Amino acid sequence: MGCCYSSENEDSDQDREERKLLLDPSSTPTKALNGAEPNYHSLPSARTDEQALLSSILAKTASNIIDVSAADSQGMEQHEYMDRARQYSTRLAVLSSSLTHWKKLPPLPSLTSQPHQVLASEPIPFSDLQQVSRIAAYAYSALSQIRVDAKEELVVQFGIP
């Protein structure tokens, strides 16, 4: 019938062929979708090279994928967990010892020895913030109005013959 969840027992040859191609991409199709025999000799070599390159990329990607859903979390015993944890910690120790340039950097400056008290204190009143902003604006205005007037020449020529 036409329902979303209905199942039909009789499949057409084309449906079976499509399922076969989807399930097994390495199988070569015996018929094209229109029923004609495929002509492999008419394909240009660039197309086959591109297809081979794409197939190799797909194979590399498939070999690098870890199927997390297929991993059995119950199959590992505690001593295996401990061995892996020890192995990871030794790898991290080797990597951290090779990163000596990180150790040479100075630590961040500390403005206070008790930052939790500074963060827990009362916030600065808004009037104080406005006053600081106003003073900064006055200072900027005063600095921008400074002018240098040239009264005489900067380099004086002496009468040397």
Curated annotation (Swiss-Prot):
InterPro entries: LAMTOR1/MEH1 (IPR028209). The modification Phosphothreonine is found at T28. A lipid is attached at G2 (N-myristoyl glycine). Residues 121-161 are annotated as: Interaction with LAMTOR2 and LAMTOR3. Keywords: Endosome, Isopeptide bond, Lipoprotein, Lysosome, Membrane, Myristate, Palmitate, Phosphoprotein, Ubl conjugation. It is a lipid-anchor. N-terminal myristoylation and palmitoylation mediates its recruitment to lysosome membranes, thereby promoting localization of the Ragulator complex to lysosomes. N-myristoylation by NMT1 is required for palmitoylation at Cys-3 and Cys-4. It holds the Pfam family LAMTOR. GO terms for molecular function: GTPase binding; guanyl-nucleotide exchange factor activity; protein-membrane adaptor activity. A lipid is attached at C3, C4 (S-palmitoyl cysteine). Disruption phenotype: Embryos die at egg cylinder stage due to growth retardation, associated with altered endosomes and lysosomes organizations and impaired membrane protein transport in the visceral endoderm. Key component of the Ragulator complex, a multiprotein complex involved in amino acid sensing and activation of mTORC1, a signaling complex promoting cell growth in response to growth factors, energy levels, and amino acids. Activated by amino acids through a mechanism involving the lysosomal V-ATPase, the Ragulator plays a dual role for the small GTPases Rag (RagA/RRAGA, RagB/RRAGB, RagC/RRAGC and/or RagD/RRAGD): it (1) acts as a guanine nucleotide exchange factor (GEF), activating the small GTPases Rag and (2) mediates recruitment of Rag GTPases to the lysosome membrane. This is Ragulator complex protein LAMTOR1. The lineage of its organism: Eukaryota, Metazoa, Chordata, Craniata, Vertebrata.
